[in-house]
Amino acid sequence: MPKKTIANLSRADVEGKRVLVRVDFNVPLDDAGNITDDTRIRAALPTIQDLISKGAKVILCSHFGRPKGKVVESMRLTPTAKRLSELLGQDVVMCDDCVGASVTEAVNKLENGQVALLENLRFHAEEEGNDPEFSKQLAANADLYVNDAFGTAHRAHASTEGVTHYLSPSVAGYLIEKELNYLQSAIENPQRPLAAIIGGSKVSSKIGVIETLLEKCDKLLIGGGMIFTFYKARGLSVGKSLVEEDKLELAKSLEAKASEKGVQLLLPTDVVVADAFDANANDKTVKIEEIPDGWMGLDIGPDSVKLFQDALADCKSVIWNGPMGVFEFDKFAKGTEAIAYTLETLTGKGATTIIGGGDSVAAVEKVGVADKMSHISTGGGASLELLEGKVLPGIAALDEA
């Protein structure tokens, strides 16, 4: 069911009202406590600015890191408040907690169009426990609720699900709306041919996605460490490459299912192997039938890149989730980089390209083509679960349109 969004709220609906907005400000920091990538903060700006312009009192809440229910000084949201103030061009009131009298006092002082940021939700264990009393306390300082944290929408926490029982309306922000539009339509109503590129090291973490995509897509391209489980299932020798021994039968059944459904399932034909898992290891490119004993595959080879590029050439929609190799090591990043450039070209020709969260986002950013993609998902696990066709609790809890 479509959900009510912030776009459905008029100025009259929110002016002078206290609006609790769940955002995802779980941003990376360096050792000195500086934000190294503010993408997630910038992603929430359209929703925040819309509420400011409509005269709302904006109360932002987010988790940061994994403090496990206690106050950890290095996990305070102070650096985030500072960066957000710079981006908005106005002071953001930083609260010293997310519930309680001090928060009520700070919120009561807000003028229309002002913004407050509550302290890290996960300083309270009740947040992840979706505790009703904590949800009620969180909701007590607000009149209505907006969820714009797609990255945590697959979790039923107090700030994503619990508060919706006490605040009405509860609606989706612009970021969640965009995520749903792209990810759901890519699966339910794509321009064809639809290709999915699935990478990463483990078949086990991508089983659900591969199974769902086999029902929906025309071509499925598989790269990353999981290819060796498929090769071993075919009876090939894979040296010291990563293999999930308990998933060999599954790999066979996925290949069988693809051919039964008429889905073109492509695996690399050559790989870059190394004699150690190391950025400076000795490396060579070999055909998949010729992986030497004691060596491990860490990237797809140039022939495979060409094979994948040819398969993608006529595609109108492409979903990419997971790198082709160990792209953190420059020596083994070529396959992943080539796919990123290929998608850039396809987008330029009118294809819809969706980067489905996690490491593939880091990859397109590293290559510098992130802004050339149709859509970059901000959720890792949430994107995967949505692509798997699962119901996300944080979305299900919102009002229906």
Swiss-Prot record:
Catalysed reaction, written as an equation: (2R)-3-phosphoglycerate + ATP = (2R)-3-phospho-glyceroyl phosphate + ADP
Keywords recorded for this protein, A-Z: ATP-binding, Cytoplasm, Glycolysis, Kinase, Nucleotide-binding, Transferase
Pfam families for the chain: PGK (PF00162)
Pathway this chain belongs to: Carbohydrate degradation; glycolysis; pyruvate from D-glyceraldehyde 3-phosphate: step 2/5
Cell location: Cytoplasm
Main location: cytoplasm
Residues bound to ATP: K206, G297, E328, G357, G358, D359, S360
EC number per UniProt: 2.7.2.3
GO CC list: cytosol
CDD domains: Phosphoglycerate_kinase
Binding annotation for substrate: D24, F25, N26, R40, H63, F64, G65, R66, R122, R155
GO molecular function, one term: ATP binding
Single Gene Ontology BP annotation: glycolytic process
Family assignment from sequence similarity: Belongs to the phosphoglycerate kinase family.
Subunit structure: Monomer.
Protein name according to UniProt: Phosphoglycerate kinase
Source species of the chain: Gloeothece citriformis (strain PCC 7424)
Annotated gene: pgk
